[in-house]
């Protein structure tokens, strides 16, 4: 009986690449290391990427799409009114741990101006989405900007700064934070 290893998808490579980035920075994102974690030979890498630099480029796109675009470009969220959209966004960010790799990306951005531009563009996507939502709620100027930035900062760093929150604590704090953000 032979154990045939199924082909590993591009997204599986990228997901493991993000985990490697989180665990050890950009120097830890090595083809051989990721292949070993996936339980395959490194030759499988070349089905999806020409080289390590191409992996990095796709890694940035994957992070943007799967950890920001999933909220900001979500047609189901956009159908909701602004209050429900804000709450649903909070829940999605927490449930899917969408801020999980933000620290790793921020640290990588400090070492490379190209990466910094992409990370800044992702932050802008998040802020623009939230600015539009808070504007729909009637906020303007500094009140709008403070809410958008507070939301982005808290949700991007919650898993890093408060990793031991229980579900009950998180739920209680999320309700309070939501009420705080929508009150005039």
Model-derived features: where do they sit?
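Amphipathic alpha-helical packing segments from all-alpha helical-bundle domains
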Residues: 68, 95-104, 113-138, 146-149
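Hydrophobic/aromatic-rich alpha-helical bundle segments in the mid-to-C-terminal region
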Residues: 116-120, 135-184
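N-terminal intrinsically disordered/low-complexity leader segments
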Residues: 1-8
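Alpha-helical DNA-contacting segments of helix-turn-helix folds
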Residues: 21, 56-63, 70, 118-119
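Solvent-exposed, amphipathic alpha-helical segments
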Residues: 16-24, 66, 70-74, 105, ...
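Hydrophobic alpha-helical connector segments
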Residues: 58, 72-99, 147-151
């Amino acid at each position: 009986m032979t154990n045939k290893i199924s082909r590993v998808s591009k997204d599986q490579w990228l997901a493991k690449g993000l985990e490697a980035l989180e665990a050890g920075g950009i120097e830890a994102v090595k083809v051989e290391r990721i292949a070993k974690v996936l339980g395959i030979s490194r030759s499988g890498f070349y089905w999806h990427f020409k080289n390590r630099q191409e992996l990095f480029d796709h890694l940035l796109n994957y992070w943007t799409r799967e950890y920001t675009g999933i909220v900001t470009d979500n047609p189901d969220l956009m159908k909701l009114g602004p209050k429900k959209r804000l709450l649903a966004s909070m829940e999605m960010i927490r449930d899917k741990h969408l801020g999980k790799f933000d620290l790793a990306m921020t640290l990588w951005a400090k070492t490379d101006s190209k990466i910094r531009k992409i990370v800044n563009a992702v932050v802008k996507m998040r802020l623009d989405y939230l600015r539009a939502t808070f504007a729909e709620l009637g906020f303007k100027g500094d009140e709008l900007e403070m809410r958008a930035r507070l939301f982005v900062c808290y949700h991007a760093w919650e898993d890093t700064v408060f990793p031991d929150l229980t579900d009950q604590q998180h739920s209680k704090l999320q309700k309070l934070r939501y009420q705080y953000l929508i009150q005039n």
